[in-house]
């Protein structure tokens, strides 16, 4: 069984949730990002609050991702601290909280740096009671990070094609729980947005365990 949803950010500002609710079974919202280059700065997505409130209004389950430029454990942790203080705290989420590993500045850190950045991000948020994971392409995970230590976290994997089933290369991997099947290929409410399939009942798991702002059932 799979559940179909989307991931959106300020780039989709103005999208109608009254239309989006008809096909979105979950949403992963960009909570924040780090600007790359020499003057890196952590920022909150300008439309996160609007999108979060709209999703809650229409009872659409929500997760969050942070677009990172972290190059080591400490910087990954600092991303998580920023996200917790400015986005997560005081809110409830039905899907995991992800660190997005794709920026070239981040990838310059090499396999050890990128892997440790994921650990820093995820371990801090786990200590705060969140279900955590990472977004990374198959090539990035297996050639620019160390995949084995990261199997403890849920993996959101982009691999774009027109099929409704994930490629065999990733379908059998134990922690690949969300597949991003389209990068801007879903036309919804006048916007071209990313489409995702989830293969895990995250809302039930998270609520039962009392994670992501929920009290344990």
Q: What are these model-derived regions, one by one?
A:
Residues 1-12, 17, 150-217:
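Functionally critical loop-and-helix segments that line ligand-binding/catalytic clefts
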Residues 34, 104, 139-141, 162, ...:
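Short, solvent-exposed loop/turn segments at secondary-structure junctions
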Residues 82-99, 103, 144-175:
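Structural recognition of alpha->loop->beta junctions
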